[in-house]
């Protein structure tokens, strides 16, 4: 039986390490068909909760681990916190995969981190914007804008019940211009998020791709 962290790791390594689009990374990665639904759920879940998972790692790790280990920890934490998998199973598989990937030197750290992690001991930042950003894995710049426009309580309700968003990467600033009226800027160059984006002829012309 394949290690349940292996396929998600292969995909997320391409996203975090190479900057690949998620859909492209999934398409390029051989995934055991029997595990496809689980793998896709994990990779989307990790990316959707990236800010929160990063905060979990920073809160319990004495120093920031290198990217391969950080990806492993994010997958493991997602399985623990959002899929309610058994801690011993997740820990054992994370350690085994680290060794398989040639990261055996980090196996002890991964083991200790996952056994010690306790979500109930997490302390959110005291700053309101930062706290909401972590809690809902929402970019701080977007939280700040929502709070300014709607106030803290209503902004939190919006983040709590936010609809799924589509992330679009444009080939250039000029290509993005016609779409900006309904777009929300992200920290990444020429990448915008939309609550309702419909593909048009611009996709076929290479003006944008989906993240």
What are the language-model segments listed below?
Residues 1-211:
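S-adenosylmethionine
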């Amino acid at each position: 039986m394949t290690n349940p962290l292996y396929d998600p790791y292969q995909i997320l390594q391409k996203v975090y390490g190479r900057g690949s689009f998620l859909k492209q990374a999934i398409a390029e990665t051989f995934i055991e068909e029997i595990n496809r639904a689980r793998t896709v759920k994990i990779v989307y879940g990790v990316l959707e909760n990236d800010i929160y998972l990063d905060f979990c790692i920073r809160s319990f790790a004495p120093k920031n681990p290198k990217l391969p280990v950080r990806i492993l920890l994010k997958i493991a934490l997602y399985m623990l916190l959002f899929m309610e998998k058994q801690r011993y199973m997740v820990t054992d598989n994370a350690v085994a995969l680290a060794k398989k990937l040639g990261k055996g030197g980090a196996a002890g750290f991964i083991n200790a981190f996952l056994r010690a992690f306790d979500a109930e001991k997490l302390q959110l930042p005291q700053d309101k914007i930062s706290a909401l950003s972590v809690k809902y894995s929402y970019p701080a710049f977007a939280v700040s804008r929502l709070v300014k426009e709607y106030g803290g309580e209503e902004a939190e309700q919006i983040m709590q019940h936010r609809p799924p968003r589509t992330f679009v990467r444009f080939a250039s600033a000029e290509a993005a211009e016609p779409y900006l009226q309904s777009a929300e800027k992200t920290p990444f160059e020429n990448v915008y998020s939309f609550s309702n984006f419909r593909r048009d002829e611009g996709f076929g012309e290479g003006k944008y791709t989906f993240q």
